[in-house]
Curated annotation (Swiss-Prot):
Entry's localization field: Cytoplasm; Cell inner membrane
GO cellular component: cytoplasm; plasma membrane
Name of the protein this chain belongs to: High frequency lysogenization protein HflD homolog
Pfam family, one: DUF489
Keywords: Cell inner membrane, Cell membrane, Coiled coil, Cytoplasm, Membrane
Coiled coil: 81-130
Organism: Erwinia tasmaniensis (strain DSM 17950 / CFBP 7177 / CIP 109463 / NCPPB 4357 / Et1/99)
Database matches in Gene3D superfamilies: HflD-like
Membrane topology: Peripheral membrane protein
Family, similarity comment: Belongs to the HflD family.
InterPro entries assigned: HflD, HflD-like_sf
C-alpha cells in the first residue's frame, strides 16, 4: 500500500513543533501562544476525521513545525540547538513506541485525556489548572515508560513551576503527534530512506502557505 506522505509529513511536523516549543520554553521561558495552543489542542481530538483535523484543519497551524522539520532533516550538526531539536524529536518517537507496547499506559492515558476534556468545560486550555493536569499526565503515565527526555536550557527558567508544566504538557502533545505519525504510516526508517520525499512535501505545503507556486 502506497504511503500518504502528506499525512506523514503533517504528523511529523506536529512532533517537530512540540520539540521546538520545548526548546524555546527551556531557553527563553516563552513561546508563541497560538502555536502552543495548536499543539495542546491536538491532545483532545482522539478520533479525528483527518490528520489535518488534529491540528485545527489549517496547514498554517503547523507552519512552525514544518519549518522545524526542514531544519531537522537538513541539519548535519551534532552540536548546539539543532542537535537538541533532533534529540527531542527522536526521543518522542522512542517514547511513543514504549507507550504503544504498554496496554496499561495506553488505558491510563485514554482515561486521563477524557478527564482533561471534561475539565475543558470549566477552564481555558492554556490555564495553569489544565497545564498542570497535562504535565501530571506526562509525569505519571509517560515518564515511567523511559528513557526520560532530558530537557536542557536555562537553569533559572527550568526551575519555574509554570515553565516545567508547559514543557511537560508540550512533550505530551509531542507524544500525541508521534502516535498519529505511526497511525498514518510513519516510521523512523523514513527519516533516512525517504528524507527527500519528506523534505519536498514539507516545502510544498510551506509554498502553499506563502502563496508561492510549486
Amino acid at each position: 500500500m502506497a504511503k500518504n506522505y502528506y499525512d506523514i509529513t503533517l504528523a511529523l511536523a506536529g512532533i517537530c513543533q512540540s520539540a521546538h516549543l520545548v526548546q524555546q520554553l527551556a531557553h527563553q521561558g516563552q513561546c508563541s501562544q497560538d502555536v502552543l495552543k495548536t499543539s495542546l489542542s491536538s491532545l483532545l481530538d482522539l478520533n479525528p476525521p483527518s490528520t489535518l483535523a488534529v491540528f485545527g484543519n489549517q496547514e498554517a497551524n503547523l507552519q512552525f513545525g514544518l519549518e522545524t522539520l526542514l531544519a531537522v532533516l537538513n541539519s548535519s550538526s551534532r552540536q548546539g540547538l539543532s542537535a537538541e531539536l533532533t534529540r527531542y524529536t527522536l526521543s518522542l518517537m522512542v517514547l511513543e513506541r514504549k507507550l504503544n507496547a504498554s496496554k496499561t499506559a495506553l488505558h491510563d492515558l485514554s482515561s486521563r485525556i477524557e478527564q482533561l476534556d471534561r475539565q475543558l468545560a470549566h477552564y481555558e486550555l492554556d490555564s495553569d489548572i489544565l497545564l498542570s493536569a497535562m504535565a501530571a499526565i506526562y509525569v505519571e503515565v509517560i515518564s515511567p515508560l523511559g528513557p526520560r527526555i532530558q530537557v536542557t536550557g536555562s537553569p533559572a527558567i527550568l526551575q519555574n513551576t509554570q515553565i516545567q508544566n508547559k514543557v511537560r504538557a508540550t512533550l505530551l502533545a509531542g507524544i500525541r503527534a508521534a502516535v498519529l505519525w505511526q497511525q498514518v504510516g510513519g516510521g523512523r526508517l523514513q527519516l533516512m530512506l525517504s528524507r527527500n520525499r519528506l523534505v519536498n512535501e514539507a516545502k510544498s505545503i510551506l509554498a502553499r502557505l506563502d502563496g508561492t507556486p510549486t
